[in-house]
C-alpha cells in the first residue's frame, strides 16, 4: 500500500475528522483456464496495514470512505499474431450467486485484443459509509474474461491484470456536511503497438442511459481517415468494412500505405488524390488477407450505437458476440 499519509496515525482519536489518502494495489496473472476472474473486496483491502487501520477505526466510530477512482490495467504477455480476446467488466458486488451479471448493476463492459494493453479508469460517484462495529465490504467487482482461450497445464501466463484503488478515509459524523459528487466520465485507453488503427469495443452506463465507445471520434479513426479513406473514398470501402479493416491493419501495413501516399497531391495541398489506384490495391489486398472473425464488427458496432440511441438497452450488454 502506498500513499498512506501521516494523518492516518490520528484516526484513533474520535474528535479528529481529518482524512487519510490511500492507494491500494492488487495484481493477478491470467491464464487461459481462468475464464472468469473476480477481484473482490478481499483483494483490494487485504493488505495487513490497511486492514488493521480499518478495523481499529470501525471499533471507534463510523467510517466515511471516498473512492476517487479505480484503475484497471491489462498487461499482455503474448505475441500479436495470437488472435484472442480480453474482456473486462466493472459491476456491483452482489452477495448471492444467483445474480445475473447482465443487469442494472453493470457499469462498464469492454472487449479488446488480448495482445494489446487495455486500461479503464472509473470514478465511482457514490460514497461508502460504514457503521461502527460493521465489517468492511467493498461494493464493486472487476471481472476478467479470456473467452475461449485454452492453455495446457504449465503454460506461461497470457498476461497480468493490475488494479489500483485510490480513496480517502475519515470518521463519519452526522454533523459533517458531505457534498454530493458529480459524475465523472470513465476513460478507456488502449495500446496500438502492433495495430495502429485498432479500437476496442466498450459499453458504459452513464447518469443517463448506456453509451458505446464512439470509434468514429477516436484518434485512431482520424488517422485512418487521413491515411486511407481520403485517398480511396467511401466508394472503395464499405462502411461495414471500416472497423474490421482498422482492427486488422498492422504497423507494417500503415508504413507501406504512408510510403505510397507520401507524394500524393493531397498531402501537398492539392485538390485531388494522385495515388488512389495504388492505395486501393493495397487496401483490397489487406481486406482479402485478414482474419474473417472481424467481418461482423462493423455491423455489430452499428447495432450497439442504434440500441443506445433508441433506448433499447436498459442493461449494459456484455459484448458476448465480439471476438478477436
Curated annotation (Swiss-Prot):
Keywords: Host cell junction, Host-virus interaction, RNA-binding, Transport, Viral movement protein. It is found in: Host cell junction, Host plasmodesma. Residues 1-20 are annotated as: Disordered. One of its GO terms (molecular function) is RNA binding. It comes from the Viruses. Its main location: host cell. GO terms for cellular component: host cell plasmodesma. GO terms for biological process: transport of virus in host, cell to cell. The keyword Cytoplasm does not apply. Transports viral genome to neighboring plant cells directly through plasmosdesmata, without any budding. The movement protein allows efficient cell to cell propagation, by bypassing the host cell wall barrier. Interacts with nucleoprotein. This is Movement protein. It comes from Sonchus yellow net virus (SYNV). The gene is sc4.
Amino acid at each position: 500500500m502506498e500513499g498512506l499519509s501521516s494523518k492516518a496515525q490520528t484516526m484513533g482519536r474520535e474528535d479528529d475528522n481529518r482524512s487519510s489518502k490511500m492507494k491500494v494495489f492488487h495484481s493477478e496473472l491470467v491464464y487461459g483456464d481462468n475464464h472468469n476472474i473476480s477481484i473482490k473486496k478481499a483483494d483490494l483491502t487485504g493488505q495487513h496495514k490497511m486492514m488493521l487501520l480499518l478495523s481499529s477505526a470501525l471499533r471507534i466510530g463510523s467510517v466515511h470512505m471516498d473512492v476517487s477512482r479505480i484503475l484497471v490495467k491489462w498487461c499482455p504477455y503474448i505475441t500479436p499474431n495470437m488472435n484472442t480476446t480480453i474482456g473486462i467488466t466493472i459491476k456491483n458486488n452482489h452477495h448471492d450467486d444467483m445474480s445475473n451479471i447482465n443487469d442494472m448493476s453493470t457499469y462498464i463492459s469492454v472487449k479488446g485484443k488480448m495482445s494489446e494493453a487495455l486500461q479503464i479508469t472509473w470514478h465511482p460517484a457514490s460514497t461508502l459509509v460504514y457503521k461502527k462495529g460493521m465489517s468492511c465490504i467493498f461494493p464493486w467487482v472487476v471481472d476478467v474474461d479470456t473467452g475461449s482461450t485454452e492453455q495446457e497445464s504449465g503454460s506461461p501466463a497470457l498476461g497480468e491484470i493490475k488494479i489500483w484503488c485510490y480513496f480517502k478515509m475519515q470518521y463519519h459524523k452526522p454533523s459533517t456536511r458531505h457534498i454530493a459528487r458529480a459524475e465523472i466520465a470513465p476513460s478507456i485507453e488502449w495500446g496500438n503497438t502492433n495495430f495502429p488503427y485498432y479500437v476496442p469495443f466498450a459499453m458504459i452506463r452513464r447518469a443517463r442511459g448506456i453509451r458505446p465507445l464512439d470509434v468514429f471520434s477516436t484518434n485512431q479513426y482520424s488517422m485512418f481517415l487521413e491515411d486511407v479513406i481520403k485517398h480511396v473514398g467511401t466508394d472503395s470501402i464499405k462502411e461495414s468494412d471500416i472497423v474490421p479493416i482498422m482492427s486488422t491493419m498492422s504497423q507494417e501495413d500503415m508504413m507501406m500505405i504512408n510510403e505510397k501516399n507520401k507524394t500524393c497531391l493531397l498531402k501537398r495541398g492539392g485538390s485531388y488524390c494522385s495515388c488512389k489506384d495504388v492505395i486501393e490495391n493495397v487496401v483490397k489486398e489487406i481486406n482479402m488477407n485478414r482474419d474473417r472473425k472481424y467481418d461482423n464488427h462493423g455491423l455489430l458496432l452499428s447495432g450497439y450505437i442504434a440500441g443506445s440511441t433508441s433506448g433499447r438497452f436498459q442493461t449494459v450488454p456484455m459484448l458476448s458476440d465480439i471476438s478477436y
